[in-house]
Amino acid sequence: STGTKLENVGVVTIGEDGRVSAKSYPLDSLTDADKTVADRAAAIQAEIDKEYGAAFAKTEVDLNGEKEPGNRTEETNLGDLITDALVWGAEQQGETVDAAITNGGGIRATIEAGDITKKDVNTVLPFGNTLSIIKITGEELLEVLEASTFCTPEAIGGFPQVSGIEFTVDTTKGYDQGDEYPGTTYFAPKTINRVTIKTVGGKDFDPAATYTIATNDFMAAGGDTYYAFAAASVNYDLGLSMDEVV
């Protein structure tokens, strides 16, 4: 891989003997920067640093943005913060929600103890996802939690970071794999075998109840292991970016 953002140029050489060699070269070592473009880029960067570099909050502990052990394997304090913020953001828009879920794979960095800047939050949530509202049944909630923890304790991008949901995963049991979700590489659960939900929104879980969930637009469209979200009876976007909500 040559990385991202056109930072490197990759050269692959295939010899007559079939041997393959690959090298990566930093792009800035191959070309001279155009002064006009470089000056403009520096000015834009200065504006960004001014806007996003100012501290607006403080944390006394590191907020865990690691993949594993972390947001793709277990509950984390950063996952709690983000999903609590989704609930708060929805309520600020006049929505009444029971809980919030975001995929652990969408959390991309740790915030170290100390001052917190907009840049920190944007680095944690870099994809521009927006806050969405869905309504699903308790049975559908069980399905997405079962599907999204199918390989736990191994890491999975869809691992559910939640607010307002108390649930457990019995990792001693295997995943009862059903049919493949259309257009994905994931499989629905044939039965609910590993996940038990205790409460949602502070009330005893009811598989027949309908729950209002705050989530992100990627998941609301069925991303990762959340195929059931795409068929939710109510599904709409509030147009608020997650990083701004947090």
Model-derived segments and spans:
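Hard-cation-handling environments
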Residues: 31-116
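Preference for short coil/turn "hinge" residues that link or interrupt alpha-helices
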Residues: 2, 56, 71-74, 129, ...
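Active-site-adjacent helix-turn-beta-strand microarchitecture at beta-sheet edges
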Residues: 1-55, 152-160, 179-181
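Short Gly/Pro-enriched turn/cap motifs at secondary-structure boundaries
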Residues: 2-4, 75-77, 122
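Feature captures C-terminal
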Residues: 8, 19-22, 81-246
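Short amphipathic
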Residues: 23-25, 55-62, 133-135
